[in-house]
Amino acid sequence: YQLDSFPTQQNVRAGRFYPYYRVKRLAAEPLLDAIDTSTGRPTKFKNLPLGTRAIELPDAEYPNYFLNTFGKPRRASVCECERTPDENLAQALHTLNGDIVSAKIADPAGRIAELMKAEKPPLEMIQEIYLATVCRLPSAEETEVCQQIVAESPSPKEGYEDLMWA
């Protein structure tokens, strides 16, 4: 799962053997689950225990603005064609300005708050954020940029929250 998403001169001709990861859009349910996992804050669905993942929802009777915005089908038929794979303005605005993602990142019981309580050194904080969000360690150049962002932020917590959001 940690394959590079860019083809190289060595592997570009071996496309059918999956030598690199082909980037594709996540469906609504796995996307919300990924956000929950990376931020450390699960979504609460009505009448279900905390920690129930979006992918585990038994039917379409669990309204959720995020899932609806990102194309979760109503399941009126068994056809996968109900799912809307296209990006739209509502998704872009929700990602940029929506309160769900930012609230999960800034949650006092979330991953950033827990890392701050552990008083880890800045490099470890950046590495943890990268592993939680993009499943890899940052490159030396990325680490340098991240350290600069945190240093220029009003507070370290806000800097780390900005890194996770980005």
Predicted feature residues:
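An acidic, gly/pro-interrupted, aromatic-rich
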Residues: Y1-L137
